[in-house]
Amino acid sequence: MRSSAKQEELVRAFKALLKEEKFSSQGEIVLALQDQGFENINQSKVSRMLTKFGAVRTRNAKMEMVYCLPAELGVPTTSSPLKNLVLDIDYNDAVVVIHTSPGAAQLIARLLDSLGKAEGILGTIAGDDTIFTTPASGFSVRDLYEAILELFEQEL
């Protein structure tokens, strides 16, 4: 079990490094992981991880060739700037309505759907800039509203 937890920690660190889009070689990734305490990491293991997660080399904003994860595999999280795309959250007796920046609703809805029923979300319907979210059994609309506010760190 301990090695499984260590492996999950390695995968999280590896993905976080690739999201920084600043590593141009496998050797740089090895050194960065070693700096984070993963002493048994080597170039061949990094190479296998790059293949496993579908990492590609592409140009970053500075036009440098760097390793990164494909967009679909880089699962969005609420600690990323996604929360900045949420403009307003409100509710009525039936649904929670979330207004987003134009074009962002489907991305935010995907994140909410990934949380699932255990977090109180039965499902979402997303347009271009609006999301309808309905609570799962055992959750009130108000409970879901408060959970979504907390998720996106919005004020009541």
Curated annotation (Swiss-Prot):
Q: Which InterPro entries match?
A: Arg_repress, Arg_repress_C, Arg_repress_C_sf, Arg_repress_DNA-bd, WH-like_DNA-bd_sf, WH_DNA-bd_sf
Places the protein is found: Cytoplasm
GO cellular component term, pick one: cytoplasm
The protein's annotated pathway: Amino-acid biosynthesis; L-arginine biosynthesis [regulation]
Which key words tag this protein in UniProt? Amino-acid biosynthesis, Arginine biosynthesis, Cytoplasm, DNA-binding, Repressor, Transcription, Transcription regulation
Give the superkingdom in one word: Bacteria
Q: Which GO terms describe its biological process?
A: L-arginine biosynthetic process; protein complex oligomerization; regulation of arginine biosynthetic process; regulation of arginine metabolic process
| GO MF term list | arginine binding; cis-regulatory region sequence-specific DNA binding; DNA-binding transcription factor activity
What family does this belong to?
Belongs to the ArgR family.
Role, per record: Negatively controls the expression of the four operons of arginine biosynthesis in addition to the carAB operon. Predominantly interacts with A/T residues in ARG boxes.
Q: How does it assemble?
A: Homohexamer.
Q: Which protein is depicted?
A: Arginine repressor
Q: Which organism is it from?
A: Salmonella typhimurium (strain LT2 / SGSC1412 / ATCC 700720)
Name of the encoding gene: argR
